[in-house]
């Protein structure tokens, strides 16, 4: 396609710009947000509010997709207009720690497991909404699928052992 063709499709409302060089058909059912995220960020792992909602530790559907990505990746790569995203830049060796797979809208995704998600929540608790934080902790404590040895291993690697013992140890 030539630029003039793309411009015409944009002006007529058939396509929408995601970022430079990336567009999607507005009417297409294959342009779900998660498909776009998987395409643009195949190395990213869903985390924080997105993972909390996935595991039903939060009843609030996140306004933006949260994912962890290698901190050495260019910031320009995450500068997109749609969908709304929040990239957590972390150490390269920690990106795959606690990674598992799941399905969102029939699309396979990389997502952190329950235990890693709670460690991330504890690490970022000062930046989180208090209600979401409290529900996440209560949801995890009451979850029969929690894995305490994994939680403690992740807590050690992510340096949140003290918070885990203070905030979750009381409930276990």
Model feature map: region roles:
Residues 1-11:
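Short amphipathic alpha-helical interaction segments
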Residues 13-20:
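A short, conserved structural fragment
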Residues 22-172:
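Nucleic-acid-binding surface
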